């Protein structure tokens, strides 16, 4: 949902939009909670409170102040990510298709011939890093830029088996126009940028597990971050390959040679970062014009020095000349070298050309060896061709996508590799590598071992759920890693499947109860965003491709109502109850009936079950930003930090009742996952709360009324307001609590409206209006370790007779309290109080 805050109402009516006017009788937290549970996507928030907007944004719900009508029109028609700290709106708006254009934030693409293959009459537009060049389009009171691009489709095309780009991009645009927006993917770059800047400033050592190409720009300015990936393809790994011949295959209609060069250099750069944790000088020989340098410089102040007879406009220092092996002495330590020398074929015959290429390959290799033979802190990437070669067994092979698969590949070496054992590799084996292997990632660092790191902050986004990891080892890492942000795939199945297929892999699935964490926040993507100064207009959908975000070591853990809080917890329930169900009271009715409470009068205002916990369980797929386990734990230890709001603390027994209702719901829905989740949450409640039951009571609290509107034959009709199992020495403690609650007890609006047979020969009158105070009293006794209440649900009633009687129904009648007392069962009254 998105909340657009206005000082005045608007005349125009928008689809899927609801107006909420700030309620001055409620505080900012209560207003935020009410807004978050509205069911439309767009909320126009009138007479708004800035504090309420802050609360919503911290909860991951985008809430933006609107000053002008064009701001409202722009934000209401598309989704966006909001940096509420810097007041920047990142639109995810593809309406630019109506200008017959596709967009990119990678400058090198604009220098290709891609426009020859676009839809007729269409053009390509460069919009800058995260759409920064579009800021001039929006003259708004907040900073605004459109981060939507078609780079995802362009890159997917490059790695696909499709050659016809026009058909491919047409298909992708049609898909985008007919499917739900992949909002997490669109906002992810904004999130990653913010995340790692924050972590690097707060932690001396940061480890990142499983980065992919979409992060290749994110880490350019963070050389200190240790990366773990799937490892490199080494020269020695070619021993598994059979010999093949030249294949020759076109991968792309437009020229992607620059993309290949950029990937080669970035792969080399991240190898250098992995070894030396600082920024090097980047030397490049050949590969002009290297327009992609412009892209790199949008993210980092890396320095480039280049040699090529052709211009390289974005190099910091360009030598418009050839580079010879004697020039290696000009190259300094603390650097990387990219050797991409290859003479143009022009009109040469194949044999002459092949001879020159092989000579240049040897020359390239010699330049690399010479460069690595002296000095320190050096890594080299060199262009090679398929030919009989001796190569260091530990050197890394690269074959990033290029326009045509021919005979070229690349080799990365560091100083140690260049001096390592060399192995003869036949030309046919290298052709086999070229024909069958595409390097899919610029991060080729070693795989991560699932072991706790003592001094590091571990980030593992979408990296650990794969079933080649041991599931128990993943759980141990989450439980024991002190500082971390780790995601795992949430179990969205209805049959409690332990793993699910996704694309061409299988992932383990998890529930929050799989983890034993007492100082970690377990939330959703949008809940996590709120903790890093971001919010989002479109919450995650229960697609099956959803992840739990687990933050360990965060200073926000105790701020229960500020982050990963209960905002939107009733939203799915409202959507169902007010559109599909038998009555809008269906949730209240079901919760009472499933706990054998058949008095449904006033069930919507006096419910005996925690609606928060019930909704968090049965609708967990729709809203798991609320960290239910943390909420339970912090209340059980009395450590919850509550900033504001009319905050009701549930008695632990109310939580148990909610689990029982959720379990019944799961059985009716044949939802095995919710069934397990409910059982495990109930077990967790019993673990963190020391709940004892007065199933063998020796004292009870009684309430005698001045008026009973029914006939009765018992001596003193009364409401048993709970039973206790206490020693005689604890009586003063019980009395002290009753005195503390005196005012609230006598203020109860107690009513009755019918009689019924509670069981054989027990004739009773119903009592309404007491449950809320009962549970507050329960909490007070619990905190003093006084056993109060039974394991079965408390059903308030007044016993009228121990014989069968006819049921009577009357108009709701108020019962006036005469006095309240504490009495020993089959004994004397030890305390009483009147108003």
Curated annotation (Swiss-Prot):
InterPro entries according to UniProt: VP3_Rotav (IPR011181)
Region entry GTase/RTPase activity, spans: 556-692
Keywords: GTP-binding, Host-virus interaction, Hydrolase, Inhibition of host innate immune response by virus, Methyltransferase, mRNA capping, mRNA processing, Multifunctional enzyme, Nucleotide-binding, Nucleotidyltransferase, RNA-binding, S-adenosyl-L-methionine, Transferase, Viral immunoevasion, Virion
Region (2'-5'-phosphodiesterase activity): 693-835
Domain notes: Contains a bipartite N7-methyltransferase domain, a 2'-O-methyltransferase domain and a GTase/RTPase domain. The C-terminus contains a phosphodiesterase domain that degrades the 5'-triphosphorylated, 2'-5' linked adenylate oligomers produced by the host cell in response to IFN stimulation.
Subunit structure: Interacts with VP1. Interacts with VP2.
Protein name per Swiss-Prot or TrEMBL: Protein VP3
Organism of derivation: Rotavirus A (isolate RVA/Human/United Kingdom/A64/1987/G10P11[14]) (RV-A)
């Amino acid at each position: 949902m998105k909340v657009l805050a206005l000082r005045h109402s608007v005349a125009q009516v928008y689809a899927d939009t609801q107006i909420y006017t700030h309620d001055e009788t409620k505080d900012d937290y209560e207003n935020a909670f009410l807004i978050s549970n509205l069911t439309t996507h767009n909320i126009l928030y009138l007479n708004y409170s800035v504090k309420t907007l802050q609360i919503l944004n911290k909860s991951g719900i985008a809430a933006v102040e609107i000053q002008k009508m064009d701001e409202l029109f722009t934000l209401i028609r598309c989704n966006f990510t909001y940096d509420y700290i810097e007041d920047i709106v990142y639109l995810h708006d593809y309406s630019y298709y109506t200008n017959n254009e596709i967009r990119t934030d990678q400058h090198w693409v604009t220098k290709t011939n891609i426009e020859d293959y676009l839809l007729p009459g269409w053009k390509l537009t460069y919009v800058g890093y995260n759409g920064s060049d579009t800021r001039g389009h929006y003259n708004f009171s907040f900073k605004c830029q459109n981060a939507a691009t078609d780079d995802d489709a362009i890159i997917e095309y490059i790695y696909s088996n499709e050659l016809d780009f026009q058909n491919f991009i047409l298909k992708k645009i049609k898909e985008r126009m007919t499917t739900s927006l992949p909002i997490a993917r669109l906002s992810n770059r904004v999130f990653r940028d913010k995340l790692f800047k924050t972590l690097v400033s707060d932690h001396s050592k940061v480890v990142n597990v499983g980065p992919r190409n979409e992060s290749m720009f994110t880490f350019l300015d963070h050389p200190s971050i240790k990366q773990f990936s799937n490892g490199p393809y080494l020269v020695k790994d070619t021993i598994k390959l059979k010999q093949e011949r030249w294949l020759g295959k076109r991968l792309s209609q437009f020229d992607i040679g620059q993309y290949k060069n950029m990937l080669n250099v970035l792969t080399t750069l991240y190898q250098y970062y992995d070894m030396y944790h600082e920024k090097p000088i980047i030397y490049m020989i050949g590969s002009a014009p290297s327009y992609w340098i412009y892209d790199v410089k949008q993210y980092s102040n890396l320095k480039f020095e280049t040699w090529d007879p052709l211009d390289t406009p974005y190099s910091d220092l360009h030598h418009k000349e050839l580079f010879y092996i004697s020039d290696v002495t000009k190259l300094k330590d603390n650097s990387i070298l990219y050797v991409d020398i290859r003479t143009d074929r022009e009109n040469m015959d194949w044999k002459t050309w092949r001879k020159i290429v092989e000579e240049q390959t040897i020359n390239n290799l010699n330049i690399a060896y010479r460069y690595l033979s002296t000095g320190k802190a050096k890594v080299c990437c060199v262009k090679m061709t398929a030919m009989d070669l001796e190569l260091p067994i530990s050197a890394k092979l690269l074959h990033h996508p290029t326009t045509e698969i021919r005979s070229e590949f690349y080799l990365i070496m560091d100083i140690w590799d260049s001096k390592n054992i060399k192995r003869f590799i036949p030309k046919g084996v290298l052709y086999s590598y070229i024909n069958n292997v595409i390097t899919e990632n610029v991060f080729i660092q070693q795989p991560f071992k699932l072991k706790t790191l003592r001094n590091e902050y571990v980030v593992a986004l979408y990296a650990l759920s794969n079933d080649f990891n041991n599931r128990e080892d993943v759980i141990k890492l989450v439980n024991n890693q002190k500082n971390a942000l780790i995601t795992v795939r949430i179990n969205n199945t209805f049959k409690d499947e332990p793993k699910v297929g996704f694309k061409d892999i299988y992932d383990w699935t998890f529930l929050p109860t799989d983890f034993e964490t007492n100082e970690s926040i377990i939330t959703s993507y949008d809940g996590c965003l709120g903790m890093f100064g971001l919010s989002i207009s479109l919450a995650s959908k229960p697609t099956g491709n959803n992840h739990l975000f687990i933050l360990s070591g965060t200073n926000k853990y105790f701020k229960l109502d500020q982050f990963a809080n209960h905002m939107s917890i009733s939203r799915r329930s409202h959507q169902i109850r007010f559109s599909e169900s038998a009555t809008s009271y269906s949730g209240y009715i079901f919760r009472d009936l499933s706990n054998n409470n058949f008095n449904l009068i006033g069930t919507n205002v006096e419910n005996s079950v925690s609606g928060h916990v019930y909704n968090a369980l049965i609708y967990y797929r729709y809203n798991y930003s609320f960290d239910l386990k943390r909420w339970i734990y912090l209340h059980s230890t009395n450590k919850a930090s509550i900033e504001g709001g009319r905050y009701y603390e549930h008695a632990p027994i109310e939580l148990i009742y909610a689990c029982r209702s959720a379990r019944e719901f799961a059985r009716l829905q044949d939802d095995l996952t919710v069934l397990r989740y409910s059982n495990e949450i109930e077990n967790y409640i019993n673990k963190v709360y020391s709940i004892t039951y007065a199933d063998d009571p020796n004292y009870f609290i009684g309430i005698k009324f001045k008026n009973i509107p029914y006939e009765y034959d018992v001596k003193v009709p009364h409401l048993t307001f709970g039973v206790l199992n206490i020693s005689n020495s604890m009586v003063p403690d019980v009395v002290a609590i009753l005195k503390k609650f005196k005012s609230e007890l006598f203020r109860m609006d107690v009513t009755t409206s019918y009689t019924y047979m509670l069981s054989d020969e027990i004739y009773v009158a119903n009592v309404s209006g007491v449950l809320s105070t009962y549970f507050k009293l329960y909490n007070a006794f619990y905190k003093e370790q006084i056993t109060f209440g039974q394991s079965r649900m408390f059903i308030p009633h007044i016993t009228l007779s121990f014989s069968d009687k006819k049921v009577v129904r009357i108009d709701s009648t108020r019962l006036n309290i005469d006095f309240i007392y504490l009495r020993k069962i089959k004994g004397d009254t030890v305390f009483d109080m009147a108003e």
